């Protein structure tokens, strides 16, 4: 897409929101409480602030304000307001490719925000526990928040990720013509690195005419030892391992597809 000569500021709003899920099996009520306490501490407001602040540093944004809160009994929220440094729109790369990791600081944001909320929870009886982090990066201007995607997924490695990217509003060129998007995109996947894509099953549901893009990700490899809390596979019988594996797989399928799967 050729560079547009705009009349005034770029008024497009670009929002990337995604949920990351960590799934775990904790056999007893005490184990489930222990997992919730553990994951709540791992992703407390201070840790989330560090992650989001590093994100701002990577994409070259100025932090204007930070609001953070840990909740009782669990959960945390962090919101960071940011603004961009001066940037020449002609120097902005809007092509589809993975965004930067900490070693590559290349992007800038404008009058924007980054926020995260966490939601630990557990099944009342089945031993299943899930942790969800809900993250949104919203920008106004020439830069796409998709540049932050690759780093955040690397930082918050998860079993399942669901992402939505949307461009809202319009901007006007010097001839008065409205433009409802200012860059080419056919999939969020084009902004992820190859090594990341190789780890996940991925599926797109896009509404191109509305500038709405949706991608789901679920880990390909399943190793039971990574999903047990306070337990090891060798401590379980073959029957227990099969039952737990079935429970975890069903849980992950339901989250990935966004619907309950009936018992067979």
From Swiss-Prot:
Pathway: Amine and polyamine biosynthesis; S-adenosylmethioninamine biosynthesis; S-adenosylmethioninamine from S-adenosyl-L-methionine: step 1/1. GO terms for molecular function: adenosylmethionine decarboxylase activity. The keyword S-adenosyl-L-methionine applies. It holds the Pfam family AdoMet_dc. The active site is at 112 (schiff-base intermediate with substrate), 117 (proton acceptor), 140 (proton donor). The keyword NADP does not apply. GO terms for biological process: spermidine biosynthetic process. The record marks 111-112 as: Cleavage (non-hydrolytic). Transmembrane segments: none annotated. Keywords: Autocatalytic cleavage, Decarboxylase, Lyase, Polyamine biosynthesis, Pyruvate, S-adenosyl-L-methionine, Schiff base, Spermidine biosynthesis, Zymogen. It catalyses: S-adenosyl-L-methionine + H(+) = S-adenosyl 3-(methylsulfanyl)propylamine + CO2. Its EC number is 4.1.1.50. InterPro entries: AdoMetDC_fam_prok (IPR003826), S-AdoMet_deCO2ase_bac (IPR009165), S-AdoMet_deCO2ase_core (IPR016067). Catalyzes the decarboxylation of S-adenosylmethionine to S-adenosylmethioninamine (dcAdoMet), the propylamine donor required for the synthesis of the polyamines spermine and spermidine from the diamine putrescine. Heterooctamer of four alpha and four beta chains arranged as a tetramer of alpha/beta heterodimers. NCBIfam families: SAM_DCase_Eco. This is S-adenosylmethionine decarboxylase proenzyme. It comes from Yersinia pestis.
């Amino acid at each position: 897409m050729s560079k547009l000569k705009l009349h005034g500021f770029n008024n497009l709003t670009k929002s990337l929101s995604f949920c990351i899920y960590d799934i775990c099996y904790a056999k007893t009520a005490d184990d489930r409480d222990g997992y919730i306490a553990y994951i709540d501490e791992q992703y407390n407001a201070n840790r989330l602030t560090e992650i989001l602040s590093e994100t701002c540093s990577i994409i070259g944004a100025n932090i204007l304000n930070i609001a953070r809160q840990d909740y009782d009994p669990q959960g945390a929220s962090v919101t960071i307001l940011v603004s961009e440094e001066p940037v020449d729109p002609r120097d902005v790369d809007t092509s589809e490719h993975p965004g930067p990791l900490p070693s590559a600081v290349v992007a800038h944001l404008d009058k924007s925000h980054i926020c995260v909320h966490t939601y630990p929870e557990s099944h009342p009886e089945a031993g299943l526990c899930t942790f969800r982090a809900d993250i949104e990066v919203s920008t106004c201007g020439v830069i796409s928040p998709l540049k932050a995607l690759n780093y955040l997924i690397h930082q918050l490695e998860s079993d399942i990720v669901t992402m939505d990217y949307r461009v809202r509003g319009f901007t006007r060129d010097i001839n008065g013509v409205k433009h409802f998007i200012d860059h080419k995109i056919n999939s969020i996947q084009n902004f992820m690195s190859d090594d990341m894509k190789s780890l996940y099953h991925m599926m797109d549901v896009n509404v191109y005419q509305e500038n709405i893009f949706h991608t789901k990700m679920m880990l390909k490899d399943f190793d039971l030892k990574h999903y047990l809390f306070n337990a090891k596979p060798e401590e379980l019988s073959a029957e227990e391992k099969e039952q737990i594996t079935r429970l975890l797989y069903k849980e992950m399928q339901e989250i990935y597809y966004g619907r309950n799967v009936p018992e067979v």
